[in-house]
Swiss-Prot record:
It comes from the Eukaryota. A zinc finger (C3H1-type) spans 213-241. One of its GO terms (molecular function) is mRNA binding. Residues 103-127 are annotated as: Disordered. InterPro entries: Plant_ZF_CCCH (IPR050974), Znf_CCCH (IPR000571). It comes from Oryza sativa subsp. japonica (Rice). This is Putative zinc finger CCCH domain-containing protein 64. Keywords: DNA-binding, Metal-binding, Zinc, Zinc-finger.
Length: 527
């Protein structure tokens, strides 16, 4: 084997040719593999240690290993030369700096075996002396700061619900006898296997002190599971005692990790109770509030409102925080989207992408099962409700028009007969009917509607309903419209009318109405 290592190892080879799947041992017992290049101690890079946040004990342990079948230097899979490949968990970490030191691991054919043996003996003496000193420091270091999180294989986390290393020797060091390790030779293969157990744990363990950021919203994932995938880069607050922080205030909007514009638009700009505040007051309404106040085992056990529905639109999940079947939301959806003689056709298969409905309990169960941090996503609300920025509306309408669902249209087609016109549809919605009959200064002589049954008037009404949203509108209707973005659905469905009842250029007329800031319902014309 020594002759094989010294004479047959190619000088220009910089990677272990052992199979990536680790089906064969690194020493090449089958005769088809070359031995691992990691047969000599390699000086670790302290810079890499700090940047990776890996414990120094991992570097000291690995730098003392002469050879092990668990580690190899590899350049495959697009990895940088000098990466450390850990077999037990399949993780690659760039620990060592490739260069002249790696090249010096190989003895040339011109070097005599006597000199090689002398160098080997001197090197082993230095390694043994350094190992004994570093192992003493490492164990003191580990006893002072290491904590172990149960239930996670190879996970070493410094967190609020963890045990100390002293109480978890069975979980971390397992079968390792520290006294025996200190007295054994570093080249002993059986000893290396035990050393690597501690090395793998320290490599993969996230020795991270999660940042405490007073004044910032609580990290929803950390509050629920006790750890955060963003570690020190997370911008939210990670209190040490996360269980004592679950008060009524923390279940409010700050626990949802939402932007200020999304959570406080109604409360700050219009003096109306925020949707998030109202929903979190009843902790069964929002997934985030429920998950913040409940353990993962309690989620999905029927403690949430089964009538709540999440709707996936344009790849994002939107929350219907009211009962879809019994509230004014049903009226806004049904009577705004009623169509005349809608028939299911292939256009919805090729042009439109279905909207996926998911019940809250099913979504939470899957999210907890998949360890998903994004239970739902709140779409950015327009900066103003009464007079929103037209760019926001037009951009959303252009995108959303490609995702109108055929399930909902089919549902309307099966439920309703043949409504006479779009005017009859909106007449069942009080707030829309108020807009339709609006007259300046309540002058009864001007109550005569300016709208007709054609598509232009329908689109014109849609724009007026959006841009002249009445201040006297009921709070329930306003919340329903905002929370479900139904203010988008009405003009979008109306824009689909050319598919059934008109020429294609009507779509352009609709966009002209939306883009025209001078359009006003009082004259019923596009100025």
């Amino acid at each position: 084997m020594e002759k094989y290592l010294e004479d047959e190892l190619p000088g220009d080879r910089v990677e272990c040719l052992r199979q990536v799947e680790f089906e064969k041992d690194c020493w090449g017992e089958t005769g088809m593999q070359l031995p691992c290049r990691l047969n000599k101690p390699v000086k670790p890079s302290v810079l890499d240690a700090q940047s990776l946040g890996v414990s120094l004990i991992a570097f000291r342990t690995l730098s003392s290993v002469k050879h092990t079948s668990r580690l190899c230097m590899t350049g495959r899979l697009g990895l940088k030369k000098g990466c450390l490949l850990v077999e037990e968990v399949g993780v690659c970490i760039p620990l060592f700096e490739p260069g002249d030191q790696v090249g010096q691991l190989r003895s040339t054919q011109t070097t005599s075996k006597r000199k090689a043996a002398s160098r080997k003996g001197q090197r082993e003496q230095r390694v043994n002396a350094r190992l004994q000193e570093e192992r003493r420091k490492d164990m003191a270091f580990a006893e002072s700061i290491w904590t172990f999180m149960p239930g996670k294989k190879g996970s070493v986390v410094q967190g609020p619900n963890t045990r100390t290393l002293t109480n978890a020797h069975d979980g971390i060091l397992d079968d390792i006898n520290c006294a025996q390790i200190a007295g054994k030779h570093v080249g002993d293969h059986s000893n290396c296997a035990n050393v690597i157990k501690a090395g793998v744990i320290s490599l993969l363990g996230k020795l991270v002190q999660y940042p405490e950021r007073p004044g910032e919203p609580f990290c929803r994932y950390y509050m629920k599971f006790g750890e955060c995938k963003h570690m020190t880069f997370c911008k939210y607050n990670h209190p040490k005692d996360r269980f004592s922080c679950k008060t009524t205030n923390t279940i409010r909007s700050e626990s949802l990790c939402l932007h200020d514009q999304q959570t406080t638009i109604l409360e700050n700009q219009f003096g109306l109770p925020s949707l998030v505040d109202k929903a979190t007051a009843n902790t069964t309404n929002l997934v985030a509030s429920a998950s913040s106040s409940m353990t993962p085992d309690e989620i999905g056990e029927g403690k949430n409102n089964p009538d709540e529905v999440f709707v996936c639109i344009c790849g994002e999940k939107l929350l219907f925080h009211t009962n879809f079947n019994t509230t004014a939301v049903k009226e806004l959806v049904v009577f705004a989207l009623q169509r005349r003689n809608i028939k299911y056709c292939d256009i919805y298969v090729t042009w439109l992408i279905p909207m996926e409905y998911e019940r809250m309990d099913e979504l939470i169960d899957r999210a907890v099962r998949d360890n998903n941090n994004d239970l739902f996503y709140y779409v950015n609300l327009p900066p103003e409700l009464i007079n929103p920025y037209k760019d926001t509306w037009v951009t959303f309408l252009s995108d959303f028009s490609r995702y109108i669902i055929h399930q909902l249209l089919q549902y309307l087609n099966d439920t309703f007969g043949d409504p006479p016109s779009w005017i009859a549809d909106i007449s069942w919605v009080p707030d829309m009917w108020k807009t339709y009959n609006y007259s300046p200064n309540n002058n009864s002589t001007l109550w005569t509607p300016r709208y007709t049954l054609d598509l232009n008037s329908c689109s014109h009404f849609a724009r007026n309903f959006l841009n002249h949203f009445g201040r006297e509108v009921s709070l329930q209707a306003a919340e329903a419209a905002v929370s479900q973005n139904l203010e988008f659905l009405l003009p979008t469905i109306m824009m689909l009318m050319p598919v059934y009842s008109g020429p294609h250029h009507w779509n352009n007329d609709f966009m002209e109405i939306l883009l025209n800031t001078n359009s006003d319902r009082s004259n019923g014309q596009i100025s």
